[in-house]
């Protein structure tokens, strides 16, 4: 049975209830004939992006039991402090030194060290984290940085080629290639801990080889644009077996912008519980195709309720974007801030309607939440 694991390398060195699920020149991909076989050549893309990916090392101290053998007996001698290191990757997103990585790469870190592709080693400051998307923002002070330009994950298509760049097994600046296998995957891998905002999972799935240490690395397209932050793999043993997942850059950029400005993500919520549609449900509603997500519950006095949405409505679009799964709805709503006016399209009693929703934060207001 496959399990989902975060791709992090570790070593020992010494409305809170609402919104849940029930025009530049392109770097062309060319082909190189080799004994009758044609291979895609991504060397230009790799050269343009590899300097934008960094190696991250974190250090944390843990208290562990100390045992000692005494005349054949194991005696508990209390506890001892040991340093543990974890390794991952990060993506430079600005000339000012901001770096996107995964929350699980830097979680509980007491020290964070970044190694650039040119071998410079610099300390990093943690600007903020967003456990709901498993993202974190770091900042370093260094000259001559080469950030990877942002792409558009919305326009990414299943089947298009991509590169994954990271540091698997501490093998720095490793590039692997594949295609986008699927979009809007909700894998249930971000743990919903008490007091945390609802997880947002709408991953890009790829078959590019990803292994421990790739966490926080880049997923780039054939135009040398960043379209995702590598996060996890699906594997029975924790190593690559053909399935890996990345956070869409359109979502990641909003998280980075908010952490940079506020220290906390300003995330909008509708205040609904939804159920994904099935063919039988669509037939019962008189629909010829399976589409939208069904509002199983509308939280009283929250955003959707105030806009007139009701239990049993079929939500079809958010901000003009079709939402046919819980993941798609969460991603689209999560890109907006509390107070944003968002147009939604829904189906009720055989007719399609539209309304405008004023999104709220997880506390049911439109106020800015700061760290």
Segments predicted by a language model, with ranges:
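Conserved PDZ fold ligand-binding element
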Residues: 96-103, 303-326
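A structural signal for beta-strand boundary/capping segments at domain termini and interdomain linkers
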Residues: 121, 352-354
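Sec-dependent signal peptide recognition
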Residues: 2-7
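Serine-dependent protease modules
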Residues: 17-284, 288-291, 296-300, 326, ...
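C-terminal motif of bacterial Sec signal peptides marking the signal peptidase cleavage site
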Residues: 13-14
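Short hydrophobic alpha-helical segments used for membrane anchoring or interfacial signaling
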Residues: 92-93, 346-349
């Amino acid at each position: 049975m496959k399990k989902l694991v975060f791709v992090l390398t570790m070593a020992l060195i010494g409305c809170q209830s609402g919104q849940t699920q029930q025009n530049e020149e392109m770097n062309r991909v060319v082909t190189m004939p080799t004994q009758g076989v044609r291979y895609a050549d991504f060397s230009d893309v790799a050269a343009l992006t590899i300097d934008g990916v960094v190696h991250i090392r974190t250090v944390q101290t843990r208290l562990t039991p100390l045992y000692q053998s005494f005349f054949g007996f194991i005696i508990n001698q209390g506890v001892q402090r040991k340093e543990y290191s974890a390794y991952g990757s990060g993506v430079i997103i600005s000339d000012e030194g901001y770096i996107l990585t995964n929350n699980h790469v830097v979680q509980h870190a007491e020290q964070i060290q970044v190694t650039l592709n040119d071998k410079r080693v610099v300390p990093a400051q943690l600007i903020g984290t967003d456990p709901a998307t498993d993202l974190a923002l770091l900042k370093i002070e260094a000259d001559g940085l080469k950030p990877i330009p942002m792409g558009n994950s919305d326009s990414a298509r299943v089947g298009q080629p991509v590169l994954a760049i990271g540091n698997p097994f501490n093998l720095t600046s490793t590039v692997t290639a594949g295609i986008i296998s699927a979009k809007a995957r909700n894998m249930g891998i971000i743990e919903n801990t008490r007091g945390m905002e609802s997880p947002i999972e709408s991953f890009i799935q790829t078959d590019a080889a990803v292994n421990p240490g790739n966490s926080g690395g880049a997923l780039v397209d054939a135009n040398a644009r960043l379209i995702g932050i590598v996060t996890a793999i699906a594997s029975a043993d924790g190593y690559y077996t053909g399935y890996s997942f990345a956070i869409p850059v359109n979502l990641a950029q909003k998280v980075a912008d908010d952490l940079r400005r506020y220290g906390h993500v300003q995330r909008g919520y509708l205040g609904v519980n939804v159920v994904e549609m099935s063919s039988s449900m669509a037939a019962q509603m008189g629909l010829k195709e399976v589409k939208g997500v069904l509002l199983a519950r509308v939280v009283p006095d929250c955003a959707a309720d105030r806009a007139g949405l009701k239990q049993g409505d079929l939500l079809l679009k958010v901000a003009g974007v079709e939402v046919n799964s819980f993941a798609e709805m969460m991603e689209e709503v999560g890109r907006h801030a509390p107070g944003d006016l968002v147009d939604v399209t829904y189906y009720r009693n055989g007719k399609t309607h539209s309304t405008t929703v004023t999104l709220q934060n997880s506390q049911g207001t439109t106020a800015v939440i700061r760290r």
